[in-house]
């Protein structure tokens, strides 16, 4: 059997254990705009990179942060068209769960549901894997903050901070180096700092959502993001000066 057949067939493993179509879907994620999630003590922050819109395009029509339920929010990296299908299924499941159980679904339940759909599309004929990864965030009924990540293979896992999309490895390393279980203000600043590692400065390129327990999801406006970017840039300059001063003293 030629290698080309493994390349085309979604349900056939290559001799060395690869499902190439799943790996190609993951590559589509790596080419998508970056998204980060940070879980604080009593807050969760989602930050996403926004693509520049055409001059005549309405920027308000392009949203990468989506509300699934009163307490659950999702963002993604990868193919936007694929995300619409998954988001639609997740919204329907949230509504169905409320009608059936008469309670809101947990963040883990919805994460597992989305991952289950992604997994089924890796072993079914006539379909292809979803070319997106998702970050799903929200609070459980006991007030516990949750951040889950899913990928095209159908796996899902819980994180304190995570990054998906382009340069997610370097952004993830930055989060790993700088993350602490911190206050709301520091969590928001960490998400902005992580995005600014690879995103050009400016409110037009960044979207931030703040999720608090039993409160409406808040999308920061351009003025608030501008202030945050200015504060983060100023802190980076101070840090550079301190490092420069320390080197000179040595």
Curated annotation (Swiss-Prot):
Signal peptide: none annotated. It is found in: Cytoplasm; Nucleus. Pfam families: Proteasome, Proteasome_A_N. One of its GO terms (biological process) is proteasomal protein catabolic process. Keywords: Cytoplasm, Nucleus, Proteasome. PROSITE patterns: PROTEASOME_ALPHA_1 (PS00388), PROTEASOME_ALPHA_2 (PS51475). One of its GO terms (cellular component) is cytoplasm. InterPro entries: Ntn_hydrolases_N (IPR029055), Proteasome_alpha (IPR050115), Proteasome_alpha-type (IPR023332), Proteasome_asu_N (IPR000426), Proteasome_sua/b (IPR001353). The 26S proteasome consists of a 20S proteasome core and two 19S regulatory subunits. The 20S proteasome core is composed of 28 subunits that are arranged in four stacked rings, resulting in a barrel-shaped structure. The two end rings are each formed by seven alpha subunits, and the two central rings are each formed by seven beta subunits. The catalytic chamber with the active sites is on the inside of the barrel. Belongs to the peptidase T1A family. PANTHER family: PROTEASOME SUBUNIT ALPHA/BETA. NCBIfam families: PRK03996.1. The proteasome is a multicatalytic proteinase complex which is characterized by its ability to cleave peptides with Arg, Phe, Tyr, Leu, and Glu adjacent to the leaving group at neutral or slightly basic pH. The proteasome has an ATP-dependent proteolytic activity. This is Proteasome subunit alpha type-7. It comes from Dictyostelium discoideum. The gene is psmA7.
């Amino acid at each position: 059997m030629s290698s080309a057949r493994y390349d085309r067939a979604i349900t056939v493993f290559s001799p060395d254990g690869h499902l190439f179509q799943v790996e190609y879907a993951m590559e589509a994620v790596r080419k998508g705009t970056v998204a980060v999630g940070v879980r604080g003590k009593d807050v969760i922050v989602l930050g996403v990179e926004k693509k520049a819109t055409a001059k005549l395009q309405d920027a308000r029509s392009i949203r990468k942060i989506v509300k699934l339920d009163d307490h659950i929010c999702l963002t993604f990296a990868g193919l936007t068209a694929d995300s619409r299908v998954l988001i639609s299924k997740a919204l329907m499941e949230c509504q169905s769960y409320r009608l059936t159980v008469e309670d809101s679904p947990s963040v883990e339940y919805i994460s597992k549901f989305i991952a289950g759909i992604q997994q089924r599309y890796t072993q079914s004929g006539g379909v292809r894997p979803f070319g997106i990864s998702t970050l799903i965030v929200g609070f459980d009924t006991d007030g516990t903050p949750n951040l889950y990540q899913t990928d095209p293979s159908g796996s899902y896992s819980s994180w304190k901070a995570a990054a998906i999309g382009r340069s997610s490895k370097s952004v993830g390393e930055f989060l790993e180096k700088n993350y602490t279980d911190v206050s709301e203000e520091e969590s928001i600043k960490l998400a902005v700092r992580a995005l600014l590692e690879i995103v050009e400065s400016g409110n037009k390129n960044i979207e931030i959502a703040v999720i608090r327990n039993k409160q409406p999801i808040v999308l920061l406006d351009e003025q608030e993001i501008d202030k945050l970017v200015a504060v983060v840039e100023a802190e980076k300059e101070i840090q550079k000066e301190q490092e420069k001063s320390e080197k000179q003293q040595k």
